[in-house]
Amino acid sequence: MDSLENQFLIAMPSLNDTFFERSLIYICEHNEKGAMGIMINRPSGIIVDELLQQMELAEEPQPVTSLGREVLVGGPVNPERGFVLHTNQDCWSNSDPITDSLMLTTSQDILSCLGSDKAPDKFLIALGYAGWTRGQLEQEIADNSWLSVPATVELLFDIEHEERWQLAAESLGFDIWQLSNLAGHA
């Protein structure tokens, strides 16, 4: 299977009553060792400003650019660890480029700049991530748990959280609710 890096994983409707029900995951890394992604459509209930104040990184008052933005639940793995997915800006101590225009940063130095003129143009913050061991994601796709589509910056950063799964599914060109997770064999 080709790498799914820089793709969205769309949870099939059959994944109901699971952690990943109606989830949309941005795949940050996918190789022979496994895969890692950030769920981008489940708000945690924590506002970015509150997180920065709890970490004593916020200056008062917080600039309007981050006001109201929510921290996301990135996935069930390491939920205490923060990830910042952002447009390219190479000045943080622990940033990994994903594409020419997107990076994933795990260092705290980026947080102190959010809301200032030093912040990336577009960003989202997530706690935790979704991870798969070698071959696990490929098997889940074969089991019809996930569909994939190319990621877009617009869907990552500009669309409301609650609309992301449906809009990603609509980009496939058919009604996801009409799909069955059962596969036939001839």
Swiss-Prot record:
Under the heading Pfam families, the entry gives: DUF179
Quote a single Gene Ontology cellular component term: cytosol
Q: Which residues cross the membrane?
A: none
InterPro entries referenced in this protein's UniProt entry, alphabetically: AlgH-like
* HAMAP family, per database record: UPF0301
Q: Which family does it belong to?
A: Belongs to the UPF0301 (AlgH) family.
What's the name of the protein? Answer: UPF0301 protein swp_3600
Organism source for this protein?
Shewanella piezotolerans (strain WP3 / JCM 13877)
